[in-house]
Amino acid sequence: MINKDFKRRRDFLLNKIEDNSIVFLFSGLEKSRNNDVNYKFRQSSNFFYLTGINNPSMLLIITKISSRHSTTLVCDRPNDIDKIWHGQLPSKSSYKKEFEIQNVLYFDELNSLELNDAKNMYFEFADENRLNQFIENLNLSQPQSRYLKNNTSRSTKIDLSNLIFDMRRIKSKSEVSLIRHAAKISANAHINIMKSCKSGLKEYEVEADFI
């Protein structure tokens, strides 16, 4: 996939949502296995479908207010500990350039949301608690925070998953090409396994050939 494909998907979603709407889409979260060891990270399929980004703890916000459209990626501010354990993370300018995202902010920089005229809120209903916590933690003044919560409670809630599922049912030419390529790799791997199988082999020996 090239990054223009992800941009094209975001534009398609923008055309599908109603006017005076705001979209919230969370990335996956890292999950602790034990102590300071996490399970291998698995990105949210829908977040990856719209961004191509494979990092945790991020939020994509798309607004369609009257004639004003905007796309904002929100992420954690990198620190020295992150650099030690995960290496150099992309900068805000890197995200903008590489993934063609209009605005990139750190969570602690997000001090306003264009919700004044947002009559509809699209988000994955499974992430409702995360969305409520995000709004609760926004760095807003007390009047702003009170207004935002009141306006949020009045907005029509729409499950974003249904829209994205409809989009994902129809594959682009590049997606079809990738699926065919993956199927060919899998088919060749199974053929090689069948050729190498013989009496007395243990399962782990067959698996080693597959890997």
Predicted regions and their residues:
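A composition/biophysics-driven feature that prefers long, compositionally simple stretches
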Residues: 1-188
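Active-site pocket-lining segments that scaffold enzyme catalytic pockets across diverse folds
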Residues: 171-211
